[in-house]
Amino acid sequence: LGNVLDRDGELRLLDFDDCMIGPAVQDLWLALGGRDAATTELRENFLESYEQFRRFDRTELRLIEPLRGLRMAHYAAWLARRWHDPIFPRNWPHFGTEESWERETIDLEEQAIVVARVERGGSIAPPAAAEDEEALTNKDLFWDWDG
């Protein structure tokens, strides 16, 4: 994290200009966005400390995956809007290539599946191969799907 400094053995947080512009969980998941057990434990420890100062609505945790998908799309748009700046093609030479859009599409499709799974009360982890989970349809992935 670029906004956490270690000074004399103490962690100091700074740069809160993008904080508190959405649900509290948005600030949390950006700092602790992993899906693994270690991140889940860190997130829980953070929340226990956080709640010593302010209440946290844990039902907001279900927003992590939709916010992750939104962030993915927003990041691609952010790069595209700044592509005229010469520093961007130098630092993101893969952006805008057929391969990058293919990867972006696959990532967003996978994220949509995770969001739908969590919305139905499931885990962020894919089901075990032996499980016979009902297949997702376009209606699960697109709110305005009529077909």
How would you describe each model-predicted region?
Residues 58-68, 121:
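All-alpha amphipathic helical-bundle segments outside canonical DNA-binding/catalytic cores
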Residues 78-147:
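ATP/Mg2+ or Mg2+-diphosphate-binding catalytic cores
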Residues 24-55, 71-87:
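Active-site activation/catalytic loop segments of kinase-like enzymes and analogous catalytic loops
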Residues 1, 5-14, 21-22, 37-44, ...:
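Hydrophobic/basic alpha-helical segments enriched in Actinobacteria
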Residues 14, 50, 64:
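Residue-level detector of functional hotspots within protein domains
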Residues 26, 62-65, 90-91:
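Composition- and surface-driven signal marking solvent-exposed, interaction-prone regions
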Residues 1-28, 32, 135-147:
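Active-site acidic catalytic loop and adjacent metal/ATP-binding pocket
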